Protein backbone atom coordinates (compact mmCIF):
# COMPACT_ATOMS: atom_id res chain seq x y z
CA UNK A 1 0.00 0.00 0.00
CA UNK A 2 3.05 2.26 0.04
CA UNK A 3 3.23 4.04 -3.36
CA UNK A 4 6.90 4.99 -2.90
CA UNK A 5 7.89 1.40 -2.16
CA UNK A 6 5.87 0.08 -5.12
CA UNK A 7 7.51 2.64 -7.44
CA UNK A 8 10.96 1.65 -6.16
CA UNK A 9 10.23 -2.05 -6.69
CA UNK A 10 8.97 -1.40 -10.23
CA UNK A 11 12.09 0.63 -11.00
CA UNK A 12 14.35 -2.13 -9.64
CA UNK A 13 12.51 -4.77 -11.68
CA UNK A 14 13.50 -2.86 -14.83
CA UNK A 15 17.13 -3.77 -14.10
CA UNK A 16 16.20 -7.42 -14.74
CA UNK A 17 13.72 -6.79 -17.59
CA UNK A 18 16.00 -7.93 -20.42
CA UNK A 19 19.30 -9.68 -21.07
CA UNK A 20 21.15 -6.45 -21.86
CA UNK A 21 20.36 -4.96 -18.44
CA UNK A 22 21.36 -8.16 -16.66
CA UNK A 23 24.68 -8.24 -18.54
CA UNK A 24 25.32 -4.61 -17.51
CA UNK A 25 24.71 -5.53 -13.87
CA UNK A 26 27.11 -8.46 -13.93
CA UNK A 27 29.60 -7.27 -16.58
CA UNK A 28 32.52 -6.95 -14.14
CA UNK A 29 31.83 -10.41 -12.70
CA UNK A 30 31.67 -11.90 -16.20
CA UNK A 31 34.93 -10.23 -17.26
CA UNK A 32 36.68 -11.32 -14.06
CA UNK A 33 35.41 -14.89 -14.46
CA UNK A 34 36.68 -15.19 -18.07
CA UNK A 35 39.86 -13.14 -17.61
CA UNK A 36 42.32 -16.02 -18.09
CA UNK A 37 40.53 -18.12 -20.71
CA UNK A 38 42.17 -18.68 -24.08
CA UNK A 39 45.11 -16.33 -23.58
CA UNK A 40 48.01 -18.76 -23.92
CA UNK A 41 49.48 -22.09 -22.81
CA UNK A 42 51.21 -21.88 -19.45
CA UNK A 43 53.75 -23.85 -17.45
CA UNK A 44 55.30 -22.99 -14.10
CA UNK A 45 58.60 -22.26 -15.84
CA UNK A 46 57.16 -20.12 -18.65
CA UNK A 47 57.61 -16.37 -18.78
CA UNK A 48 54.51 -14.26 -18.18
CA UNK A 49 52.26 -13.84 -21.21
CA UNK A 50 52.23 -10.08 -21.95
CA UNK A 51 49.74 -8.35 -24.22
CA UNK A 52 48.12 -4.97 -24.84
CA UNK A 53 44.63 -4.65 -23.38
CA UNK A 54 42.12 -2.13 -22.06
CA UNK A 55 40.78 -1.41 -18.60
CA UNK A 56 38.06 0.80 -17.13
CA UNK A 57 38.70 4.52 -17.50
CA UNK A 58 38.87 6.60 -14.34
CA UNK A 59 37.85 9.86 -16.02
CA UNK A 60 35.57 9.05 -18.97
CA UNK A 61 33.69 6.27 -20.71
CA UNK A 62 36.41 5.39 -23.24
CA UNK A 63 38.60 2.45 -22.14
CA UNK A 64 42.16 2.98 -20.90
CA UNK A 65 44.96 1.26 -22.84
CA UNK A 66 46.96 -1.07 -20.60
CA UNK A 67 49.63 -3.73 -20.55
CA UNK A 68 48.57 -7.05 -19.08
CA UNK A 69 50.81 -9.83 -17.76
CA UNK A 70 49.42 -13.29 -17.01
CA UNK A 71 51.30 -16.06 -15.25
CA UNK A 72 50.64 -19.53 -13.89
CA UNK A 73 51.60 -19.16 -10.22
CA UNK A 74 50.93 -22.58 -8.75
CA UNK A 75 49.60 -26.04 -9.52
CA UNK A 76 47.79 -27.76 -6.65
CA UNK A 77 49.55 -30.81 -5.19
CA UNK A 78 46.69 -33.07 -6.31
CA UNK A 79 46.77 -31.48 -9.79
CA UNK A 80 43.04 -30.74 -9.53
CA UNK A 81 43.42 -26.97 -9.50
CA UNK A 82 45.85 -24.21 -10.30
CA UNK A 83 46.32 -20.53 -9.51
CA UNK A 84 46.65 -17.90 -12.23
CA UNK A 85 47.75 -14.33 -11.58
CA UNK A 86 47.50 -11.22 -13.70
CA UNK A 87 48.55 -7.59 -13.47
CA UNK A 88 47.13 -4.87 -15.71
CA UNK A 89 48.80 -1.47 -15.67
CA UNK A 90 47.33 1.58 -17.37
CA UNK A 91 49.39 3.45 -19.95
CA UNK A 92 50.74 6.39 -17.91
CA UNK A 93 50.86 8.94 -20.74
CA UNK A 94 47.33 8.11 -21.88
CA UNK A 95 46.12 8.28 -18.28
CA UNK A 96 47.74 11.71 -17.77
CA UNK A 97 46.10 13.03 -20.96
CA UNK A 98 42.74 11.62 -19.89
CA UNK A 99 43.14 13.28 -16.47
CA UNK A 100 44.02 16.62 -18.08
CA UNK A 101 41.01 16.41 -20.46
CA UNK A 102 38.77 15.62 -17.50
CA UNK A 103 40.06 18.68 -15.62
CA UNK A 104 39.57 20.90 -18.70
CA UNK A 105 35.98 19.69 -19.15
CA UNK A 106 35.28 20.17 -15.45
CA UNK A 107 36.72 23.71 -15.51
CA UNK A 108 34.57 24.54 -18.53
CA UNK A 109 31.41 23.22 -16.82
CA UNK A 110 32.20 25.14 -13.63
CA UNK A 111 33.18 28.29 -15.52
CA UNK A 112 36.60 28.34 -13.89
CA UNK A 113 40.13 28.74 -15.21
CA UNK A 114 41.53 25.98 -17.43
CA UNK A 115 44.12 23.81 -15.67
CA UNK A 116 47.82 24.25 -16.32
CA UNK A 117 49.61 21.93 -18.75
CA UNK A 118 51.74 21.00 -15.73
CA UNK A 119 48.85 18.71 -14.69
CA UNK A 120 50.08 16.37 -17.44
CA UNK A 121 53.05 15.68 -15.17
CA UNK A 122 50.81 14.42 -12.35
CA UNK A 123 51.95 10.93 -11.49
CA UNK A 124 48.90 8.66 -11.59
CA UNK A 125 49.32 4.92 -11.16
CA UNK A 126 46.41 2.67 -11.96
CA UNK A 127 46.62 -1.09 -11.95
CA UNK A 128 44.50 -4.16 -11.40
CA UNK A 129 45.71 -7.47 -9.97
CA UNK A 130 43.59 -10.57 -10.45
CA UNK A 131 44.25 -13.96 -8.88
CA UNK A 132 42.03 -16.95 -9.53
CA UNK A 133 42.03 -20.56 -8.37
CA UNK A 134 40.79 -22.61 -11.30
CA UNK A 135 39.65 -26.24 -11.07
CA UNK A 136 40.87 -28.84 -13.56
CA UNK A 137 37.45 -28.69 -15.26
CA UNK A 138 38.02 -24.99 -16.05
CA UNK A 139 35.64 -23.53 -13.47
CA UNK A 140 36.93 -20.82 -11.17
CA UNK A 141 36.47 -21.75 -7.53
CA UNK A 142 37.79 -18.47 -6.13
CA UNK A 143 38.83 -15.14 -7.61
CA UNK A 144 39.96 -11.83 -6.19
CA UNK A 145 40.46 -8.64 -8.18
CA UNK A 146 42.24 -5.71 -6.54
CA UNK A 147 42.06 -2.35 -8.29
CA UNK A 148 44.50 0.31 -7.07
CA UNK A 149 44.83 3.96 -7.95
CA UNK A 150 47.70 5.99 -6.53
CA UNK A 151 47.52 9.71 -7.11
CA UNK A 152 49.28 12.52 -5.26
CA UNK A 153 48.92 11.52 -1.59
CA UNK A 154 45.84 9.35 -2.08
CA UNK A 155 45.63 5.58 -2.44
CA UNK A 156 42.33 4.09 -3.52
CA UNK A 157 41.75 0.33 -3.37
CA UNK A 158 38.71 -1.62 -4.49
CA UNK A 159 38.49 -5.38 -4.05
CA UNK A 160 36.04 -7.67 -5.78
CA UNK A 161 35.98 -11.32 -4.88
CA UNK A 162 33.77 -14.27 -5.50
CA UNK A 163 33.79 -17.91 -4.58
CA UNK A 164 31.89 -20.76 -6.14
CA UNK A 165 30.96 -23.43 -3.64
CA UNK A 166 29.89 -27.00 -4.35
Residues covered by each model-derived region:
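Acidic, serine/threonine-rich low-complexity disordered tracts
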Residues: 52-166
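Solvent-exposed N-terminal domain segments of exported/luminal and surface proteins
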Residues: 1-10
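Extracytoplasmic beta-rich ectodomain segments of secreted or membrane-anchored proteins
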Residues: 9-83
Amino acid sequence: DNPTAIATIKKNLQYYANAENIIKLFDKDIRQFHHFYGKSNFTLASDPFVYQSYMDNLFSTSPTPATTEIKLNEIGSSHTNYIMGSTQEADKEWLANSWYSYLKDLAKKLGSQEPSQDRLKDNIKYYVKTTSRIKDNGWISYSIETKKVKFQDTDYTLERRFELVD
